[in-house]
UniProtKB/Swiss-Prot annotation:
Could be involved in mycobactin synthesis. InterPro entries: MbtH-like_dom, MbtH-like_sf, MLP_fam. It comes from Mycobacterium tuberculosis (strain ATCC 25618 / H37Rv). One of its GO terms (cellular component) is cytosol. The lineage of its organism: Bacteria, Bacillati, Actinomycetota, Actinomycetes, Mycobacteriales. Transmembrane segments: none annotated. One of its GO terms (biological process) is siderophore biosynthetic process. This is Protein MbtH. Pfam families: MbtH (PF03621).
C-alpha cells in the first residue's frame, strides 16, 4: 500500500496560499496549482505545519473578513 504524499512525515513540502489567504501543504514534487503561491519552504512537513499554525490564525476567507469590516 502506498503512502499518501500529503501525509508523508519524511517528505519535503511547500506552504501555499491563495487569494483568500487560505493555506495548504503541498509536496515539492507536485506542480503548484493555478491561483496558489509559495509562501514557505521547501521544508519538512513538521516545519510547514508549524508555519501554518503560526500564520493562518483566522480561517475565514479573506473576502468574508473584508466584508465584515465594511459592514
Amino acid at each position: 500500500m502506498s503512502t499518501n504524499p500529503f501525509d508523508d512525515d519524511n517528505g519535503a513540502f511547500f506552504v501555499l496560499v491563495n487569494d483568500e489567504d487560505q493555506h495548504s501543504l503541498w509536496p515539492v514534487f507536485a506542480d503548484i496549482p493555478a491561483g496558489w503561491r509559495v509562501v514557505h519552504g521547501e521544508a519538512s512537513r513538521a516545519a510547514c505545519l508549524d508555519y501554518v499554525e503560526k500564520n493562518w490564525t483566522d480561517l475565514r476567507p479573506k473576502s468574508l473578513r473584508d466584508a465584515m469590516v465594511e459592514d
